[in-house]
């Protein structure tokens, strides 16, 4: 395997005052827990869709290390550990996934088959975003650092032809920030990278608080102008899309103003455009992207779409007890999360209220994703849990399937739900012909209990493909 220079691993944790934590315990053989998700190497392939044409095919890739495929969310809810799949201009693929020795980037052919040994970014923590190049990749991740909190720093790492070309740290002592987690996104417009991620104040005006940061980096690893050092408060969810010119389009879930906001080029100040109000507090938001990293899809006419799990807002008003005048109090509309799709007129302006694709009160909806599907349709995916039992903002329930549905750019259904056996566990890559591909662990989900202890592991990934 090709490896980066080893770095000393640091203890990782989620934000302070937050129940959400990564599972970083022993990565020995799969831990069998009551209600755990079990690796099922012999899982059957997804059935063909007779009416919608949404047929998911799978290729199995063997891994050289154990992949801990679960993470604990708020209240230790079960979440997929993020993988990132990206397509290079020549059509080949890269898949990034974490292991005990660092972040592995697996090279694949256009057909989704392994084409070589993994590149291992030694000591790196967390897949924060991935860009595939013909000669390698760029990875947003966390690496060890020296700071007052003894936390990791955000870093953009570029590999060319199996060797590290640069490693640019994006937080540090001079900027008074660290990155104990990223929940990030990475974009590339052919000239520069845009990295959007969570930061922890380490000195200065924001000492001890959590916010977010947008940083631009050149193709050679030099920091560029633009972006911001402190934006959305306690960012609870990030979406980013690269643009050929100007600021990259971005969204964030903010706990203080309680909801989803446009942060494009402005870092989400008090007057940031509101996409949706949600009940949020430090470490939690009733509206959420899958794993707190969402997708932004752009239409040919310049509109945008994003999808998220939402509890909605029965009421929303400024908090009279907040002397800053910035805080909001939101009462959620539902106990369970429903599937919402929101649209923007352009990179700065929301287009009306979100459209809800589900409305069943007793069913919880998680792991919501959206991707382009052809010229004028969107693929929305989610997982459903029946007989939901909810407390303190999160729910458990009985898993009933992964749903695929096509909608148009007005949110109107173009197909009924199609329940498939594949899962979506991270970033989706769009291929040159419009087909979609992603990586996921071959496991049977269970959401009936919270996740405690270390994550179970697998040594295989499924590479799913959905033809356009």
Q: What are these regions, as identified by a protein language model?
A:
Residues 14-18, 34-50:
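C-terminal region of N-terminal signal peptides and the immediate post-cleavage residues
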Residues 8-29:
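N-terminal export and membrane-targeting signals
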């Amino acid at each position: 395997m090709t490896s980066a220079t080893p770095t000393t691993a640091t203890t990782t944790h989620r934000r302070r005052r937050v129940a959400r934590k990564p599972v970083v315990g022993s990565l020995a053989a799969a831990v069998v827990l009551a209600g755990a998700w079990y690796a099922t190497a012999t899982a059957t392939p997804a059935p063909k869709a007779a009416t919608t044409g949404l047929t998911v095919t799978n290729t199995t890739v063997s891994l050289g290390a154990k992949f801990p495929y679960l993470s604990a969310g708020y209240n230790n809810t079960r979440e997929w550990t993020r993988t990132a799949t990206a397509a290079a201009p020549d059509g080949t693929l890269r898949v990034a996934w974490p292991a005990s020795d660092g972040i592995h980037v697996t090279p694949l052919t256009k057909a989704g088959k392994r084409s070589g040994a993994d590149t291992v970014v030694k000591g790196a923590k967390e897949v924060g975003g991935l860009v595939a190049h013909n000669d390698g990749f760029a990875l947003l991740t966390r690496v060890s650092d020296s700071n007052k909190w003894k936390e990791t720093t955000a870093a953009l790492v570029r590999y060319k032809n199996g060797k590290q070309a640069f490693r640019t740290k994006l937080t540090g002592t001079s900027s008074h920030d660290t990155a104990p987690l990223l929940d990030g996104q990475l974009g590339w417009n052919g000239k520069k990278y845009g990295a959007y991620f969570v930061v922890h104040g380490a000195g200065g005006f924001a000492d001890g608080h959590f916010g977010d940061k947008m940083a631009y980096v050149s193709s050679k690893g030099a920091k560029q102008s633009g972006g911001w050092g402190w934006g959305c408060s306690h960012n609870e969810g990030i979406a980013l899309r690269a643009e050929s010119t100007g600021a990259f389009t971005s969204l964030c879930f903010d706990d203080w103003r309680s909801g989803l906001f446009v942060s494009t080029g402005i870092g989400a100040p008090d007057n940031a455009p509101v996409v949706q109000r949600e009940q949020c507090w430090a470490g939690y938001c009733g509206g959420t992207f899958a794993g707190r990293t969402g997708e932004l899809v752009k239409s040919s006419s310049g509109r945008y779409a994003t999808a998220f799990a939402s509890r909605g807002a029965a009421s929303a008003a400024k908090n009279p007890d907040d002397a800053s005048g910035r805080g909001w109090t939101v009462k959620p509309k539902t106990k369970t999360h429903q599937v919402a799709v929101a649209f923007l007129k352009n990179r700065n302006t929301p287009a009306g209220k979100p459209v809800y694709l589900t409305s069943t009160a007793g069913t919880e909806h998680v792991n919501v994703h959206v991707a382009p599907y052809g010229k004028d349709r969107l693929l929305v995916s989610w997982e459903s849990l029946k007989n939901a039992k909810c407390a303190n903002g999160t729910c458990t329930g009985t898993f009933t399937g992964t749903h695929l549905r096509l909608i148009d750019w007005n949110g109107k259904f173009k197909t009924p739900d199609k329940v498939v056996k594949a899962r979506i566990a991270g970033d989706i890559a769009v291929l040159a012909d419009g087909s979609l591909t992603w990586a996921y662990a071959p496991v049977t989900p269970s959401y009936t209990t919270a996740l405690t202890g270390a994550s179970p592991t697998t040594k295989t990934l499924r590479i799913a493909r959905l033809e356009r």
